[in-house]
A protein has these predicted regions:
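Boundary at the C-terminal end of the N-terminal hydrophobic targeting segment
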Residues: 17-21, 521
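Polysaccharide-binding surfaces and accessory modules of carbohydrate-active proteins
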Residues: 21-32, 36-40, 44-248, 264
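Glycan-recognition and catalytic regions of carbohydrate-active enzymes
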Residues: 589-607
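Bacterial N-terminal signal peptides
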Residues: 6-16
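Aromatic-lined carbohydrate-binding/catalytic grooves of carbohydrate-active enzymes
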Residues: 308-449, 458-459, 463
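Short Pro-Gly-centered flexible turn/kink motifs
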Residues: 95-100, 268-287
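Glycan-recognition surfaces
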Residues: 406, 411-445, 449, 490-592
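Active-site and adjacent substrate-binding regions of carbohydrate-active enzymes
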Residues: 35, 135, 147-149, 324, ...
């Protein structure tokens, strides 16, 4: 510890000397997290420049001349900035340019190994401020960066762009690894060398936003990424909605990394005195290749971003592949018996347990939104069937999709104005369903009531699978004002986090899996409220192993739900081996399995 303090003091003194010797420098300071360091310079023009981002051991000296504007840490639109802007606003008087000057910074220790620096910026001509937050988790060389925008102008300021961070990297070459794909082939790793210009990775889906691309990437410096050697930066955005990553290689071969919410269709009208907060972007740095960067993400997540990270995940049996929506109490009891025989610890009752009369959930066209248990399938109710599982020493969990509704439902007939849609347009369905407008307070109350009335009277339900089976195609709200329609993408997601937080705090003993038609919602914005996630509906082990490997770059194995199924008609041993690399589960009709197959599964459960 004494050596670390001595080194930090030496670097601070060294920077002070350099600042005193350079007529262009007003202040130099660093923010360091283990091996990762950000070096800042405040110029005599009062702008905040970034001199380095990367290896903490690398000394960065201020330039002999005033840096050009492309080195501004959070470049605002207009007034001489020619690169991709991080912040763009229209002020109340119509001025579309913003100037940001440094007014100070402070650093505080939040907990052992966690420090936070806040850098204060202000427009010299307007009461418009941006505060940059940099939280350092020093044990894992991790930085978490976000910012807040506030103003006191006499009216609304329109925010057009609002990046979470925009650091600049300097290297000879940049190799980008992204994790893209589509339904049943999610998180497929693709690596390419970046050339001069702007490369965009994004999602425009709103919810189930990560079906085609997860909000994470790896940047290898000076060559393709290797497992155990070479410099890499790994990053992940804590946001479950539309996002955008812009990789801007300029004429001097510098790379700016603009990351955050997708600004498309999302301009935000910020009221006087209001605060706009961006999601956080996580960065870690490694000189030992992407393997060490991945392990740092895992260690950080286990300590900071996963619910009950050290708690054992139950081996569960899911009924979906065995029954779909066609089951009754006797069939479920047969499945409970199968779960007990192989040693499964929990039975998860999937879709199909709710809806009555003409809206009975007998297929995916009916009943979504009507969350009363089916009197046809479960005449004795949820409490009875949960206790039947417990009699067999098997826990009981349930499937919920609180954000969705079928047009063929009682809820839709009563509240057609509750859905996300656009006026004068034919509704576009996804999986025969619509999305409830979570910006609307009545919907927020309704969705909480779904969770509360399902779980509170039924304390034997100890697990929830929270699903979300479509994305937004017609962004519009009958609740939001016409001028604020573009708020939908952002306000929906913040409301969703509030609901998830209420669920996690209200039912601390109920474990939860995050699902969205596969991996449509996998990020560290949502994971603090969940124990695991469903990475894909592709459970063919040959395809699944690639998907799980992709997610493992950022997420620990105990968060990646992995089930044994018949998909692909592979050898059962292969399906078991692949599933054992994650949070193990079973999705089979065990009563139709052979004795040898049940024995194989039972042996796997014991592991």
């Amino acid at each position: 510890m004494k050596n670390i303090l001595t080194t930090c003091l030496f670097l601070c003194l060294l920077l002070t000397v350099h600042a005193a010797d350079n007529p262009n420098v007003k202040k130099l300071f660093t923010v360091t997290s283990g091996e990762l360091k950000l070096t800042f310079m405040v110029g005599t023009d009062n702008r905040l420049y970034q001199l380095g981002f990367g290896d903490a051991a690398r000394e960065v000296e201020p330039p002999a001349k005033m840096p050009s504007r492309e080195w501004e840490f959070l470049p605002p639109y207009g007034n001489g900035v020619l690169t991709e802007p991080a912040i763009q606003a229209t002020h109340v008087d119509g001025n579309t340019s913003t100037e940001l000057h440094y007014t100070g910074h402070r650093t505080e220790t939040l907990a052992p190994g966690i420090e936070q620096t806040v850098i204060l910026l202000k427009d010299p001509a307007y009461p418009f401020t941006v505060d940059i937050y940099i939280k350092c988790y020093t044990d894992n060389s991790m930085m978490e960066i976000w910012n807040t925008v506030t103003h006191n102008e006499k009216g609304k300021v329109i925010l057009h762009r609002f990046a979470s961070a925009a650091p600049v990297v300097k290297a000879k070459e940049y190799w980008l690894s992204q994790f893209s794909g589509n339904y049943k082939r999610e998180a497929t790793l693709n690596e390419e060398r970046l050339s001069e210009g702007v490369k965009i990775l994004d999602s425009k889906l709103g919810i189930r936003a990560h079906q085609m691309r997860i909000p994470s990437f790896i940047l290898s410096l000076n060559g393709p990424a290797k497992e155990n050697e070479g410099e890499v930066l790994a990053a992940s955005l804590r946001w479950s909605s539309s996002f955008q990553f812009a990789f801007d290689v300029d004429w001097n071969k510098n790379l700016r990394l603009l990351t955050g919410m997708n600004p498309l269709g999302s301009q935000y009208n910020l009221e006087r005195g209001g605060t706009f907060t961006t999601p956080a972007i996580l960065y870690t740095y490694s000189k030992q290749g992407k393997g060490e960067a991945s392990r740092r993400f895992h260690r950080w997540a286990m300590a900071n971003a996963i619910r009950d990270a050290e708690k054992d995940r139950p081996v569960l049996l899911n009924n979906w592949e065995a029954t779909h929506c066609d089951f009754d109490e006797d069939r479920l009891k047969q499945l409970f018996d199968g779960a007990r025989q192989v040693g499964a610890e929990l039975f998860l009752l999937d879709d199909g347990w709710f809806g009555n009369g003409p809206y009975s959930r007998d297929d995916d066209k009916h009943g979504l939104g009507d969350w009363d248990p089916s009197t046809k399938k479960l005449p004795k109710g949820l409490s009875y069937i949960a206790k039947e599982a417990l009699k067999r020493k098997v826990g009981f969990g349930i499937w919920l999709e609180p954000e969705m509704v079928n047009p063929q439902s009682e809820l839709y007939q009563k509240h057609p104005d509750w859905i996300i849609t656009q006026p004068k347009r034919e509704p576009i369905l996804g999986r025969h369903q619509e999305i409830l407008d979570l910006t609307r307070p009545e919907v927020q109350a309704f969705e909480w009531d779904i969770i509360d009335k399902t779980l509170r009277p039924n304390p034997d339900i100890t697990y929830v699978k929270w699903d979300c089976n479509r994305y937004i195609t017609q962004p519009g709200s009958s609740y939001l004002q016409p001028a604020d329609q573009s708020h939908l993408w952002i306000d929906y997601n913040w409301a969703l986090y509030r609901l998830m937080d209420r669920f996690a705090k209200g039912f601390p003993n109920v474990m939860a899996m995050l699902c969205a038609g596969g991996s449509g919602r996998v990020d560290y914005g949502a994971m603090p409220y969940f124990h695991s996630f469903w990475p894909s509906d592709n459970t063919d082990p040959l395809g699944r192993i690639k998907i799980q490997w992709g997610f493992s770059h950022f997420f620990p194995a105990n968060t990646i739900s992995a089930h044994v199924t018949r998909m692909g008609k592979r050898h059962l041993k292969m399906a078991i081996d692949v599933a054992l690399s994650g949070a193990f589960g079973i999705d089979l009709a065990l009563d139709k399995a052979t004795a040898e197959e049940r024995a194989q599964i039972a042996d796997a459960v014991k592991l």
